[in-house]
Amino acid sequence: MSKIQKIVFQNVSLQNGVVQAKVILSYQLFGQPVGSAPLVVVNHALTGNSQVIGENGWWQSLIGEDKIIDTKKYAVLAFNIPGNGYQDAENLIENYQDFTTYDIANLFWKGIDSFKVNQVFTVIGGSLGGAIAWEMAAIRPKAIANLIPVATSWKASDWLIGNVLIQDLILNNSKNPIHDARIHAMLLYRTPESLQEKFHIQLQNSEGLFRVESWLLHHGEKLQNRFQLSAYKLRLKTTDIFKNKNRIEIIKSINSNIHLISVDTDYFFTANEIKTAFQEIKNYNNNAFYHEIKSIHGHDAFLIEFEQLNNILKPIFN
């Protein structure tokens, strides 16, 4: 496992004008040394972390030796979003409500700058990680060769904002806030068909607990004490690369090859929403490409349908 390393930033100005006295940005490096090979930045999703490869790597089917993102060919850099507390309580932050996806993207650029790299071959991320990738492209529109936002959008939708409200109510009123919020979120990431295929309305034990209930409770317990989930939900709501900016100019300015990847059954970031963004980009640039994963599994398909995702990414990384 690659060692977790840290960069400490002092007096970081946030989008809302607050100055954060100290921010610790942790990360892991995989593959080739930064500067010796094309750099691939991988942004983790809501409950992910910087461990993208290996036995516990959340994208181990995509990244590693002789895989689509081949660590024998690329330098792979994965940051931890400040506040996720991955393997370090020091990575927790108290005033999570002050941070937006823009602020996280800006911190990631500061982290990349510490390696003295001016050009990034690819920034890829799913869900929240993809939203941060969009923000990174808007901040430095000429610095990324390939932008790959997966199962995400460049602006929070009404559906997403509404579900953030439900999450906030759970977090503020439940006796087991993170546990219960996670259970609700798990249903947003799947579809009725996905759960039916997985559980078949079967009982888990003689006490009358259904397998789907046991699965949901397990995920609630697993996340408890591991994440500040409320921080993540708030950041999703704050996604908007056009905030206080000229929409058309932002779109025109992004020089990257933009590969928008949707899931046809995603309720969280719908395929139609992502396709609409693609069509808008095509009005001004010819550097956008639309791809759609077919799956019964909904939003989480980007963590499940690896064969389809591999086929989409193969031409980019070969």
What function would you assign to each model-found segment?
Residues 1-39:
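Catalytic-loop region of hydrolases
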Residues 28-86:
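N-terminal cap/lid subdomain of alpha/beta-hydrolase-fold enzymes
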Residues 102-121:
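Conserved acidic catalytic loop of the alpha/beta-hydrolase fold
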Residues 119-158:
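Conserved hydrolase catalytic core segment
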Residues 143-222:
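Alpha/beta-hydrolase-fold enzymes
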Residues 254, 260-262:
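Short beta-strand/loop motif that positions the catalytic acidic residue
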Residues 267-273:
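Conserved alpha/beta-hydrolase "acid-adjacent" motif
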Residues 275-318:
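Catalytic active-site module of serine/aspartate enzymes centered on a nucleophile-bearing elbow/loop
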